[in-house]
Amino acid sequence: RDSVASRGLGDVYKRQAESETPVLCEAKRWLDIYFSGREPDFTPPLHPVGSAFQQAVWALLLEIPYGETTTYGTLARKLAEKQGLTHMSAQAVGGAVGHNDISLIIPCHRVVGASSSLTGYAGGVDKKIKLLELERADMKSFFVPKKGTAL
């Protein structure tokens, strides 16, 4: 009988670890640090796929410090400034934020609505709250709107 139980789980985990790529190992290490309640001091190698506009928005998300938040409007103003524009739509920025497939490492949970409303997280507002609490963000002024998702 050569069952998993008789071989021990160590063999299973060892084979799994041997098959992981360096990129996956780095991402796993980042996630382990993050979910232990500490700020990772590195960003694993990322290759998000999206339009030039989405890439620009996601780059701004990576600049939001651990435990802090910003608004869609602030991101729109920063992006407009970087691109030499007078105005950028917060809704357009919100759309790009919403298409972020690496939503934990590229921290879209740190973006809130204009009036400190907790809106627009693909994993659900309850998860957004938990992630911000894990980062020890100051949650006093935030609220979950009863209707709408004003950016």
Language model segments and positions:
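Single conserved hydrophobic/aromatic residue that forms the stacking wall/gate
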Residues: 2-13
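N-terminal positively charged helical leader segments and presequences
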Residues: 16-17
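Long, low-complexity, charged/polar intrinsically disordered regions in eukaryotic proteins
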Residues: 22-37
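Nucleic acid-binding interface residues in structured DNA/RNA-binding domains
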Residues: 29, 38-151
